């Protein structure tokens, strides 16, 4: 059972970012000019102390507007993601970076965190690993410097959260580009930062945008990419256990996990164990989607092929049973001329020919 190739969308340049970055450079006001240029003071009758007090007050007012805009943009991002308006959400993340740069400056950890959020957005909302790596890399050194120097536990927690997201983004972006070693290297760093973060929380529950299960799955896939099959299987077994503990043994989240675990077992030539994983996935499909559904048909076909791959004579009946179930379910739900119906029928015919039989007409 081969893993499906991943299509990586690319663009020649990052137009949204380049335009907004240019605007932010024009918008950012040097600190020494903020009161003089925006708020000229000219009260000839005012004392020096009164003038300084007014200048300070105006400087605070000058920065309150971008801060309000930043808070609004952050709320808007969450709402747009909830509404699955991914492109608009990504553009709003760009606004957050620009506003953070204006408020905090290029070298502040909060600006770097905004860049890490943007990188994660390019990865998860847009599926653009090149842009994701670009922005994550530009944020990394700033976050690491602040992490090393901060004395505030609260600040360190937020920096560690940003680093988990940053290294996860880099890892998955490399994985999408079929660079397993680089992916695994960065995901290990994400894992170390998550461990440090959990120690700071002192065992308390921390809700992170990149969950521990997200990271476990990514590490499993990266391990598979570098052919460390035993390690990959250990990560997937952990992910399966965590999902069952959190959501029960009939959640749709388990289907793809069982499929990937079965793929690893097939690569390890443990065909019986692969069949067991696919049987569990099939059972979940039947309970969630019924026996006659495209998803259950797909899982029946995978089970048929897994039984066939074992090469054991005792599994011949199971191969036929699951191929026929799959074809019948596809015909009932998608029609006789659908691609899935035809391709599954073709695979069944090939298996019958290879085994010296003819398909009944």
From Swiss-Prot:
Chief location bin: cytoplasm
GO annotation, biological process: response to endoplasmic reticulum stress
Keyword set includes Translocase: no
Gene3D superfamilies: Tetratricopeptide repeat domain (1.25.40.10)
Superkingdom per UniProt: Eukaryota
UniProt signal peptide: none
Stretches assigned to coiled coil: 67-95, 176-209, 256-283
This protein's GO CC annotations: centrosome; cytoplasm; midbody; spindle
Keywords per UniProt: Coiled coil, Cytoplasm, Cytoskeleton
Stored InterPro entries: TPR-like_helical_dom_sf (IPR011990), TTC23/TTC23L (IPR042621)
Localization annotation: Cytoplasm, Cytoskeleton, Microtubule organizing center, Centrosome; Cytoplasm, Cytoskeleton, Spindle; Midbody
Keyword match GTP-binding: no
PANTHER family the UniProt entry points to: TETRATRICOPEPTIDE REPEAT PROTEIN 23, TETRATRICOPEPTIDE REPEAT PROTEIN 23-LIKE
Listed name of the protein: Tetratricopeptide repeat protein 23-like
Natural source organism: Homo sapiens
